[in-house]
């Protein structure tokens, strides 16, 4: 087969053959196989050229994808599939990128966890799930997590939550709120509980009473649209008790309120 035309098309070159076949190749392919118009190729040379062209094009795509941020092996492989790189070529591209240190799942996991320590608010369980979703294996994640101390981060997150809700909730409800939030963010129950030790949950009686008054007004506006009489009183009691207020304080308020 003879090359009848070589035409540059943006990042690729269009190669046309005298058997009406055509294909796109990278500049690396042109150089490697010394392609030029009227060059004759046998079947083996053509197949080698096609394989290398796919490999070269796929690698260029991967490098473009990696230019924005670190990616896992799986993320790069999925990106190549999306751009229709042949499946049997993808492992070769991944291997080359690993050898040239463009991708490294262990390093990615380490960077992700360290960045979270500096600027994030996630505990180890959520971090592991997010890294698993990126296709990083547990054996690359677990050693890094086990060597990372999350106690300071848990304290920072708990302090932020404390500052946010301190003037809105009574002590018991505030503790429960912070604990549940930390669990949701992936911290262990033990770490969530220990992070509360540096917080001051003391509130004087007047502060608690003011909070109770505000919450009672809020719940009354909401529940009085549907209920009245004894049922309304029951619903108000239940709502306030769930918020963490003392049973005696609630009953006292309800007697004077209704």
Curated annotation (Swiss-Prot):
Keywords, alphabetical: Cytoplasm
Lineage top rank: taxon: Bacteria
Keyword Cytoplasm tagged: yes
One GO term of the biological process aspect: regulation of DNA repair
Pfam families in the cross-refs: RecX_HTH1, RecX_HTH2, RecX_HTH3
CC per GO annotation: cytoplasm
Compartment(s) where it occurs, according to its Swiss-Prot or TrEMBL record: Cytoplasm
NCBIfam families: PRK14135.1
Similarity annotation: Belongs to the RecX family.
Role of this protein: Modulates RecA activity.
Protein's recorded name: Regulatory protein RecX
Organism: Streptococcus pyogenes serotype M5 (strain Manfredo)
The encoding gene: recX
